[in-house]
Swiss-Prot record:
Keyword Cell membrane annotated: yes
Source superkingdom: Bacteria
Protein name (Swiss-Prot/TrEMBL): Putative membrane protein YozS
UniProt subcellular location: Cell membrane
Predominant location category: membrane
Topological relation to the membrane, as annotated: Multi-pass membrane protein
Swiss-Prot/TrEMBL keywords: Cell membrane, Membrane, Transmembrane, Transmembrane helix
Residue ranges crossing the lipid bilayer per the database entry: 4-24, 30-50, 66-86
Organism, scientific name: Bacillus subtilis (strain 168)
GO cellular component: plasma membrane
Keyword Membrane: yes
Gene: yozS
Length: 101
């Protein structure tokens, strides 16, 4: 689980910075630099490491995925795919927690 979190975060941050360096992302984003939103989405996904409820972690993964795709676009898809795998893992964990109770 922690490996998926770090892989997702590093993929998001790396692809956003690489897209900026290669000139795929320019400064024409209305709010600011689009690459920064991709980096922010990668950092948000690291919040999952904080001990909290599984439902909160699912919301964080969803927010990270949506924010990354809106900010960076198609460059964020590898990280978004990893976030989807992470969300499936969290969903299984939530179901196991419900069966234990």
């Amino acid at each position: 689980m922690k490996a998926l979190i770090f892989l997702s975060s590093l993929t998001a941050i790396g692809s956003s910075i690489l897209g900026r360096w290669l000139g795929m992302l320019d400064d024409s984003y209305a709010v600011g630099d689009a690459w920064f939103i991709g980096v922010l989405a990668g950092l948000i996904s690291l919040l999952i490491l904080i001990d909290s409820q599984t439902m909160t972690k699912n919301y964080i993964v969803s927010l990270s995925t949506i924010l990354g795709i809106l900010g960076v676009g198609f460059i964020y898809f590898p990280a978004a795919f990893i976030n989807i795998l992470l969300s499936i893992t969290l969903d299984k964990q939530k179901k196991e927690d419900l069966h234990v109770r």
